[in-house]
Amino acid sequence: MSVTLKNIIAPTPATTRGKSVAINGDPKGENIVYASGSSIIIRNVKNPMVADIYYEHPCQTTVAKYAPSGNYIASGDVQGNLRIWDTLQKEHILKATYKVLNGAILDIAWTSDNQRLVVVGDGKERFGAAILWDSGSSCGEITGHSKMILSCDIKSTRPFRAATGSEDFAVNWFEGPPFKFQKNIAAGDFTRFVNCVRFSPDGNKLVTVGADKKAFVYDGKTGEKLIELNPAQQHTGGIYGCSWSADNNRVLTASADKSCKIWDTTTGQCINSFTFGSDVNDQQLGCLWFGDSLLSVNLAGEISTLNLDDVAKPSRVIKGHNKLVGTIAFDKNAGSLYSASYDASLLQWDLSTGLATNFTGPAHKNQITSIKINGDQLITCAMDDSVKISSISKKTYGESIGVDSPAQAVAFSGDVVVAVSMKTIYVIKGGKIVSQTAATWEPTSVAINDTEVSVGGKDNKIHVFTLSGNNLTASHTLDNHRGAITDLSYSPCGKYLASGCSNREVIVWSGKEAKSKGWVNHTARINAVAWSNDSKFVASASLDSQIYIWNVENPTASPVQVKNSHLGGVNDVIYGSNNEIFSAGNEGAIKIWNVSN
């Protein structure tokens, strides 16, 4: 048996209210690149399911930029580390790494000959640096600012010029190499932070945008101010991003006023204005004019493709998670995938396009801990002390069914739902609690097989109950585990029960007897166990970032290992078909794996 990666549903850009989001593209016009968590995401602009993730930063990433050749990416993080790595090989071989700043790197710019970089952000001694890419040696000084530098760019044509925008309201102009400060070209122009500066592709113009809603165009050779984009048509909120068209005549801007605009940089007039919703998450924090695709990123991290034919509605919105994905479920009848993340967001995925839709109505208010699918019902429970039974066809949340403490897991059989909180086991029918059983051993997980209900506890035991009508009656316990039970799952054939624990062990039970022994290949807590549709294999997911597939018919056989599946740990794993596995991880990604026997 072998397991190969098929597709990645990548996390969306990480966002912070009031701060720009950096999204950049490759020279070929195929892939975009952005930061999310401690990863860098490479994603095909036409097909979101085609993606790659760079995991090598030791902390939260902030920005990534392709070299003009397209052969390398330079990426930065909050600790001031700059990593330059190969894009042509799957392994992304590291070319160089430098400690450039003492604080977060916020923007990066390459010279068109691929030899030099300007790196800016926060720091104690300096807010920017100009370096040679292959040695890290200085090729100038980025000076003249008294506060954090938020943005930088380099003119693509010789003689090179560099520009920087800062929290001190200045746009500084540098000539070189070696780059040296010449002047503040925006003296008196901005009254708040300068969030983004960008040279036109031909280098003839520079556009700058600020938190004071203003935008200016300067001469790309001299830094002389040419025009202010029409104040009468300006955004009504701070501008966080700008990007040039390929024809050098138009610029796209993104604003906290929940709109994007296209401007004619010769006349200063607004040509198009794209409006979004009224929610705070509709604030636009970054944008990219990428070939024939106009992209904008909102506060929720969603990437919208703007539609020139309908300015009120994007032609496509790439949704996703930018927090850890804790639980997933697959609807075998419809072929849809469901996922929920740490921030309580719940998405339904179309696996043919990689696009997702939200449910409407009153959502959970805290992390969703479990998802199950029963026909048209989506059963969820969450840390907000509630269970919901929602309509899949209507894509609307159901009413909250309150429980006494954070809900840990749900399971169902027919019209019966069993949910466990940290204190109690609940039996739910028709959307109402019909019975509850106190549990002093803190339930953690639940599985149901017809009238047999198994509940895992922090006391290292599996408590087995018999369901009769609306009531649970204690039957027996299974106590071979030496750690708290973390997940339970009955086999589709109904003969076996799989369990995982915090002491890294997986056990398959046949009745009261353990069928498997010594399944302890994981090096950390088991987070999930799942059965293949034919009941022959069990997949386990762990905090150790590994997935193992165990052979139930041959328990002594070595399991198949999927190494380094997700950065920071695998939170859930499920089977789609016998030849397909879905996994969800701490980095916010969902991965689809092919399994071949």
UniProtKB/Swiss-Prot annotation:
Reported impact of residue 167 to A? No effect on binding to cofilin or F-actin but does not restore impaired chemotaxis or F-actin assembly in cells lacking nhe1
Q: Which SMART domains match?
A: WD40
Has UniProt tagged this entry with the keyword Transmembrane? no
Describe the disruption phenotype. Answer: Impairment of growth, macropinocytosis, phagocytosis and movement. Prolonged cytokinesis with exaggerated cortical protrusions and production of multinucleate cells.
Its subcellular locations are: Cell projection, Phagocytic cup; Cell projection, Lamellipodium; Cytoplasm, Cell cortex
Question: Mutating residue 193 to A leads to what result?
Answer: No effect on binding to cofilin or F-actin but does not restore impaired chemotaxis or F-actin assembly in cells lacking nhe1
- Provide the GO MF annotations for this entry: actin filament binding
Q: How does it assemble?
A: Interacts with cofilin and F-actin.
Please tell me what else the database record remarks about this protein. Suppresses the impaired F-actin assembly and defective chemotaxis characteristic of cells lacking the sodium/hydrogen exchanger nhe1.
Give the protein's recorded name: Actin-interacting protein 1
- Gene for this chain: aip1
